[in-house]
Regions:
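Short, contiguous alpha-helical
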Residues: 71-111, 155-211, 267
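Acidic/His-leaning functional-site neighborhoods
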Residues: 228-264
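C-terminal interaction segments
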Residues: 253-300
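Alpha-helical transition-metal enzyme core signature, strongest for iron centers
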Residues: 56-63, 87-98, 124, 128-145, ...
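A glycine-rich beta-turn/hairpin centered on an aromatic-Pro dipeptide
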Residues: 199-240
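Compositionally biased, low-complexity flexible segments
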Residues: 1-35
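Short, helix-capping/interhelical loops that line the mouth of catalytic, cofactor-
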Residues: 38-50, 93-153, 184-197, 204, ...
Length: 300
């Protein structure tokens, strides 16, 4: 599971992205604020209309296809010290781990060494089938257990379907890692990339500042992300602030100490440090130091 550091910065000039005046008038007060909780993660479909189970199986297949003829010793620069072999062995067991948690309705941590069938077979073709089987096992487990059934997660109890969404975005980001390692193009459907950003912010809101680590933003700082893909609407805007000592965010347009504007896939790759901002099509407005500090103190 992706993990990393988490949190701050000096005042800078406000950055804002242009939007119609009527949009500003309809925003903030009624918007849902997300601070230290996972709101809406239990829905089977996201604000962008993503079918989590279908998208998860699609990304699993795409991930597998990159490995069919690849040299498994290829280094993965976005996952330091890993090769494609290690990346494959990270993603596959993770799906089966989640499936077992859901199937057994666990309310406590499952030791990964106890996962049934957690190691891929040596034959490459069989390993691909094993990878597909793990993803399907999770989808089936959620269906049998019930979407809303509470189970253990590393953020506390969540509905079983939370795990499909988590594994969907874990797989999508590691698909990007594999594509970058192999010099391939990578893109996600805008609605999927936007939901990945939302899911990541939901986790940051819960985990940021843990174990005494500084928050990614200072109290006076604000980060605004604006996805330019047509049709995303509110689902393509995120304003991140600090409220009562915690990271909070909402789907709204607003001013920020720093703002990023670009396609949802470019924004996702930038905030997860898969691509330097300069290598994406995204633009930065405002205080670059706020952005750099945010990157330094948030998880990969």
């Amino acid at each position: 599971m992706a993990a990393g550091r988490l949190a701050g910065l000096p005042p800078g000039r406000a950055a804002t992205l242009s939007a119609p005046a009527e949009r500003h008038a309809s925003v903030a007060p009624a918007r849902e604020r997300h601070a230290g909780v996972t709101l809406g993660a239990e829905r089977e479909r996201s604000l962008t209309g993503v079918d989590y189970a279908g998208a998860f199986l699609d990304e699993n297949r795409a991930f597998a296809e990159l490995f069919r003829d690849a040299d498994e010793s290829t280094p993965v620069p976005t996952c330091p010290d890993w090769t494609l072999r290690q990346l494959f062995r990270h993603v596959g067991p993770g799906d089966r781990w989640a499936a077992q948690i859901v199937r057994d309705r666990l309310d406590s941590y499952l030791d990964p060494r106890m996962v049934e069938g957690g190691k891929p077979p040596p034959d490459p073709a069989d390993a691909i089938s094993w990878l597909h089987g793990g993803a399907q096992r999770l989808v089936d487990a959620v269906e049998l257990t019930g979407v809303q059934t509470p189970v253990w997660t590393f953020l506390g109890p969540r509905p079983a379907n939370w795990w499909i969404r988590r594994r969907l975005h874990e797989t999508a980001v590691h698909l990007a890692d594999a594509a970058i390692a192999l010099g391939r193009e990578f893109t996600l459907r805008p609605e999927l990339a936007a939901d990945a950003i939302t899911e990541w912010l939901e986790r940051v809101a819960v985990q940021a500042g843990g174990q005494g680590a500084p928050l990614p933003l200072d109290n006076a700082d604000t980060l605004h992300l604006h996805a330019t893909d047509p049709g995303l609407g509110d689902a393509g805007e995120w304003t991140v602030t600090v409220e009562q000592g915690r990271i909070a965010w909402s789907h709204e347009h607003g001013k920020g100490s720093v703002a990023l504007r670009g396609g949802a896939t470019d924004l996702l790759l930038a905030i997860l440090r898969r691509r330097p901002l300069a290598d994406t099509g995204a633009e930065l407005f405002g205080d670059d130091a706020v952005w750099q500090r945010w990157l330094d103190r948030t998880p990969l």
